[in-house]
Amino acid sequence: MAFDFKKKFKKFYRPSEKPEIIEIPKMNFIAVRGKGNPNEKEGEYQKAVEMLYGVAYTLKMSYKTQYKIEGFFEYVVPPLEGLWWQENVKNENYMLNKKLFNWISLIRVPDFIKKEDVEWAIKCATEKKKKDFSKVEFFSYNEGLCVQCMHIGNYNDEPETIQRMNEFAQNNGYNIELTEKRYHHEIYLSDPRKTDINKLKTVIRQPVKK
């Protein structure tokens, strides 16, 4: 059976709706950086997601090609994730004007995948699909201490959940630490094209410090 990050690391991908403090270890991803409203049709964000999945599945299926990745084992492609921020906005109000978003769109990769493997997959996907995948990069993120919980429902209702998370952190002696290297983080467990908007499951994390 293929390795599934969501099942193996439930504390990272299946938290409860009750906020908790958690230490997140360093993880490796493929990533695309961009700006703007993620809901814009055929916009930069949607193109980034398409690029990520193209490279993610090229890596996943690499064992069927002549290219061999040392230590490879079959795995389920992990869910789409995103790091989000706006310049000079450090509270939940950053959600209000989506066209001002900066973002790094992510898909986790197993530890056996290295930078050179991602570079191979970019080249392979470009040749196969006749599209530009050059914005995809290998990205390591050492997230550290966070407040985390599951948000169920519309993405537009996230500020209420974030406020509840922030209050929980502060009531337990932690401060929210949004910086140039620590970001608001979301993991998308549901496909919005196939899921009732009120049942969308999103893991939300906010970086904290004591």
Model-flagged regions — what are they?
Residues M1-K210:
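A solvent-exposed interaction/effector surface
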